């Protein structure tokens, strides 16, 4: 076993980087509260082991004691081509880590995610990520970066909703899916593999997300709850269902890319 570089998550630095010029106004007790709320000691206990990439994902599952039931492993293509793996996003953290472990193991670690900037602060995950700043703008540079990664020899893991699932009409489900995975998969000739992840966050998470929407808050407070939600997943069992690849040739001009994205979303929930 090679020597690993121990890591820690400096939540104080993360909070201050998000606060910008207002960082000095944040009371110390608020930062300390966040450290406790986010179970920083527990998280850093794992990060200090220094795992990186797919090894990080696999060992995070072990550390949390999460049990996985995977159906449809035979649907993971073995023809040497590059694919786009798309999934619903019910949990916002452990679902991404889990798919990284499953798909990364199958394809020798050659995977990439679209990843929010909070997760990019985890050094073990960062090498797998394409940074998407949910708290700021980067549209032009992001489009170019995404195209480059789709054109690479990495398998793409995408959560097209962008955010984790919400309580919509009393049902936990993704928001409307974005269309970019259709566009870039077509441009780079990638068939699409649908995946369904069965899971839910706490009721508290959905209440906070609902109030953020009602109050039209720019800052995504619900995202700051995700480390605690991941901690709550300790010892739980999740079912993942992998569907058969959808040929990219199906996504013709009979529908818009937006409509095709919702069609794939429906296929995922039918798994």
Language model feature labels by segment:
Residues 4-7, 142-271:
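Non-catalytic C-terminal accessory region of glycerolipid acyltransferases
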Residues 39, 80-137:
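Catalytic core of membrane glycerolipid acyltransferases/transacylases, capturing the structured
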Residues 66-75, 114-117, 140-148:
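Short, charged beta->alpha transition segments
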């Amino acid at each position: 076993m090679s020597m690993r570089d121990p890591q820690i998550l400096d939540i104080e630095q993360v909070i201050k980087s998000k606060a910008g010029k207002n960082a000095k106004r944040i009371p110390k007790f608020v930062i300390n509260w966040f450290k406790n709320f986010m179970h920083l000691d527990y998280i850093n206990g794992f990060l200090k082991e220094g795992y990186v990439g797919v090894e990080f994902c696999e060992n995070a599952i072990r550390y949390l004691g999460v049990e996985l039931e995977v159906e449809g492993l035979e649907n993971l293509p073995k023809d040497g081509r590059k694919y786009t793996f798309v999934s619903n996003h019910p949990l916002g953290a452990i679902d991404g880590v889990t798919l990284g472990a499953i798909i990364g193991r199958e394809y020798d670690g050659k995977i990439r995610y679209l990843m929010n900037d909070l997760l990019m602060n985890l050094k073990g995950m960062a090498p797998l990520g394409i940074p998407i700043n949910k708290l700021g703008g980067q549209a032009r540079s992001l489009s170019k970066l995404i195209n480059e990664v789709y054109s690479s020899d990495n398998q793409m893991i995408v959560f097209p909703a962008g955010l984790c699932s919400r309580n919509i009409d009393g049902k936990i489900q993704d928001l409307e899916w974005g269309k970019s995975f259709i566009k870039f998969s077509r441009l780079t000739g990638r068939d699409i593999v649908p995946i369904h992840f069965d899971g839910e966050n706490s009721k508290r998470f959905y209440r906070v997300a609902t109030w953020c929407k009602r109050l039209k808050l720019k800052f995504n407070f619900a995202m700051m709850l995700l480390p605690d939600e991941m901690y709550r997943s300790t010892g739980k069992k999740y079912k993942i269902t992998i569907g058969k690849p959808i040929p990219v040739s199906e996504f013709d001009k009979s529908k818009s890319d937006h409509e095709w994205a919702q069609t794939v979303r429906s296929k995922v929930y039918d798994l």
